[in-house]
Amino acid sequence: MDTMGRHVISELWGCDFDKLNDMEFIEKTFVDAALKSGAEIREVAFHKFAPQGVSGVVIISESHLTIHSFPEHGYASIDVYTCGHLDPTIAADYIAEALGAQTRETIELPRGMGPIEIKQAKAL
């Protein structure tokens, strides 16, 4: 049985404070990342927190991309989940580079296959 989807979860450290705190920049980055991976965008929702931080989601026909940013720590958690033949690493790599991540820890989980098994773990 083929996997129903691939879920990339990344911990991004050493990111640029201003980028992590700029909702418009993050929204554009996530929309661009989805399009670069070949996804079809359905909905986009982002929220700016006070005094800082952004959370958001891009819903795609193939699943979703999400972020929670913590500029005061230079940190962002991102998820890119795709179903079908899309490669979620294309979007995740694009996002990490756009945010200026100095360190990145990533796991990729196959989805819809039964018990979770970590397929890969890598760090920048």
From Swiss-Prot:
Coiled-coil residue windows: none
UniProt-annotated site: Cleavage (non-hydrolytic), residues: 62-63
A Pfam family recorded for this sequence: AdoMet_dc
Active site: 63, 68, 83
PTM note: Is synthesized initially as an inactive proenzyme. Formation of the active enzyme involves a self-maturation process in which the active site pyruvoyl group is generated from an internal serine residue via an autocatalytic post-translational modification. Two non-identical subunits are generated from the proenzyme in this reaction, and the pyruvate is formed at the N-terminus of the alpha chain, which is derived from the carboxyl end of the proenzyme.
Cofactor(s) required for function per UniProt: pyruvate
Keyword Nucleotide-binding: no
Its EC number(s): 4.1.1.50
UniProt keyword annotation of Aminoacyl-tRNA synthetase present: no
Major enzyme class: lyase
GO molecular function: adenosylmethionine decarboxylase activity
GO BP: any one term: spermidine biosynthetic process
Reactions it catalyzes: S-adenosyl-L-methionine + H(+) = S-adenosyl 3-(methylsulfanyl)propylamine + CO2
Free-text function comment from the UniProt entry: Catalyzes the decarboxylation of S-adenosylmethionine to S-adenosylmethioninamine (dcAdoMet), the propylamine donor required for the synthesis of the polyamines spermine and spermidine from the diamine putrescine.
UniProt protein name: S-adenosylmethionine decarboxylase proenzyme
Organism: Anoxybacillus flavithermus (strain DSM 21510 / WK1)
